[in-house]
Each structure stands twice: as structure tokens, then as C-alpha cells.
Amino acid sequence: MIGILGGGQLGRMLALAGYPLGLSFRFLDPSPEACAGQVGELVVGEFLDEGALLRFAEGLALVTYEFENVPVEAARRLEGRLPLYPPAKALEGAQDRLREKTFFQGLGVPTPPFHPVDGPEDLEEGLKRVGLPALLKTRRGGYAGKRQ
């Protein structure tokens, strides 16, 4: 059985893609209404609740997460017990868009032009470097156009 941290629509889609391969899934999510619970076993609990993590992890072959906004500490706690893919360090990097883009750039992976904006004074310089039209995103949190 594969464990997925998060029981939203992305977790649900992961499970639907895995079923034709004969895989089964368990989800950990704080909401009893998590939609992934329709397609797999749902453990309701907070990501950092030790009891919920233990119930979730029991009997799993491996763990992954549905998106990058899962608490890194939850991933670290599970990583010590069973295989976690991608590893917690990768999750931590993916949670900061600036760190992620800088990392990819260092590997030679093409990225759109970007400039860090830590305050209003950086915005003008960023627009000069990036040009218009431009997109301003938060460094952390948000997904799929929400708080980005």
C-alpha cells in the first residue's frame, strides 16, 4: 500500500492513475471530507499529530505527498520509518519558489526570468530586469493560481 500525505484532488488523481497498476492507497488529511477518501483509505488527522502519523504509516510500503505544501516535519518523521519519495530535503526546497528556481538554474534547467522581491523597493528593479508583462508570486504557500 502507498501512503499519500494529503487527501485532496491531486492525491485522488494519483490514486486513480495507480489503480490500473494494481496499487492501493492510504491518505492522511486533516479533513474528514477529503475527496481522496473516495478512492482509498483515509486517516483523518493533522499532519504533525504523532498518533495520526503512526496510524497512517502502519503497513505502508512507501510514502509520497500530493503537493509541496505538506509540512516538512511530517515528511521527516515518516522518512525515518519508511521510504519517502521525493525525500524531505526535496520537499523543503520545493516549498520556497526562489530557492527552487535558483536550484534549477544552477543545474542548467531553463527557467523564466525572475527577480527576488523582498519589499516594495525590489519591485521596480525586478520589473527592469524581467520586463513587462510580469508575474509576482509569493515565495511560499499557495498553489494552482491561489496565493501565487
Predicted regions mapped to residue ranges:
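Structural signal for short hydrophobic segments within the conserved structured cores
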Residues: 41-43, 92, 112-116, 148
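ATP-binding N-terminal substructure of ATP-dependent carboxylate-amine bond-forming enzymes
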Residues: 1-102, 121
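Short glycine/serine/threonine/alanine-rich loop segments
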Residues: 23, 109, 132
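PLP-dependent amino-acid enzyme catalytic core
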Residues: 63, 110-113
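Glycine-rich phosphate-binding loop of ATP-grasp-fold ATP-dependent ligases
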Residues: 112-114, 134-148
